[in-house]
Curated annotation (Swiss-Prot):
Biological role stated in the UniProt entry: GTP cyclohydrolase 1 is the first enzyme in the biosynthetic pathway leading to folic acid.
GO cellular component terms attached to this protein's record: cytoplasm
Gene Ontology MF terms: GTP binding; GTP cyclohydrolase I activity; protein homodimerization activity; zinc ion binding
Gene3D superfamilies per UniProt: 1.10.286.10, 3.30.1130.10
Cross-referenced InterPro entries: GTP-CH-I_C/QueF, GTP-CH-I_N, GTP_CycHdrlase_I, GTP_CycHdrlase_I_dom
Protein name, UniProt field: GTP cyclohydrolase 1
EC nos: 3.5.4.16
Organs and tissues of expression: Expressed in leaves and unripe fruits.
Organism the protein comes from: Solanum lycopersicum (Tomato)
Keywords assigned: GTP-binding, Hydrolase, Metal-binding, Nucleotide-binding, Tetrahydrobiopterin biosynthesis, Zinc
Superkingdom to which the source organism belongs: Eukaryota
Binding site for Zn(2+): 340, 343, 412
Catalytic activity: GTP + H2O = 7,8-dihydroneopterin 3'-triphosphate + formate + H(+)
Any one GO biological process: tetrahydrobiopterin biosynthetic process
Amino acid sequence: MGALDEGHYHAEIDNEVSFELGFETQPETLVIQDAVRVLLQGLGEDINREGIKKTPFRVAKALRQGTRGYKQKVNDIVHGALFPEAGLEGGSGQAGGVGGLVIVRDLDLFSYCESCLLPFQVKCHVGYVPSGKRVVGLSKLSRVADIFAKRLQSPQRLADEVCTALQHGIKPTGVAVVLQCMHIHFPNFESAFLDSTSQGWVKITATSGSGVFEDGNADVWTDFWSLLKFRGISIDNAHRRSSGQSWCPSQSCGMPGQANSAMTNAVNSILKSLGEDPLREELVETPSRFVKWFMNFRNSNLEMKLNGFVRSRIDTRSPQGGNFNDGICSELNLSFWSQCEHHLLPFQGVVHIGYHSSDGVNPVGRPLVQSVVHFYGFKLQVQERVTRQIAETVSSFLGEDIIVVVEANHTCMISRGIEKFGSNTATFAVLGRFSTDPVARAKFLQSLPDSGSAGR
């Protein structure tokens, strides 16, 4: 795309209001909606089903808002935001006077991965050394970073583009950018049954510097890292992980391979509608990678194989007059992956299941319980529904007294207008005695592990 071409610094930023006016009928929106319908049909879904009838529009809106950086320009942000600062006189000091390093830390951003089209989270730290007796409004550093984040990206290219744009835009003595990035992992339906402990996130740190920061060993970097040390970043760790490391999990999990041509063509049309060139080297395999990921969640009529436990269920009820709470058992931290049917974005986390067993033994074993979680997770879903489905199914072999808690991080909560970073959603369903016994519910809920970052 040539994101650093001169033209990218000289144009008008889309107004948020004008973005909404007539949005539904804009050609780009219509093309994306048609493409999403093709993708849904490729999954075997009924595009007129109530839950996904409006999904094509929701996806189109999220994608266009999430890639609006292609139409935004740096000079429109920094122009008029450079302020004179009398303290920056000629003489000694990094900035030609008494002024020194300025860092804005912990900027939460998201971007779409150019390799697979899934959103990834970014914790951005931007620093610069002023020059010419000028400083820039601090909010502008965040806005410039957001321009380039709202494009299809890789961590290193994002860091380089933010750094170069700020160097050109405010002409400081130097700019430093450090990004801490998190990408959702890439389990597939088959491997998830074999390995239920796969990591939820792939993490990497990317760095970029210009001017006095161009030399990664310069003393000014030592100052920069010192000001970040309370943010959990070390110079050795960041430098090691920003070089030569595979970023997107789709590049190291047997993808792309052969994919449905109608679906890959649909993804190509989405790329064009967003303002990208599908023939750009980094994007050539992207449609196939995305379709391979997406097909993990196809609508399947596969019958659950419960190995006869439905027909020969062990009686797990407590004896008459016995203490129900004494027999509460649990299966905790079962890994969970799914795809939001409203925005076609992944959500993942953990599932906790409580049940009653008079002898304290799981009659079927953890692997079967985990398989139930995966079976209902690897579909287009909403968290409320999958929680209920898991509870109803495990009650067929764990007994009628069931409590299920699902904790999940939803990508749609960070990669759309709401952008609520760090949020986590918990849902629970209860059957049998758990639905009427608050003491039993409380006992189970109090036993849950601290999973404030479920799935991470």
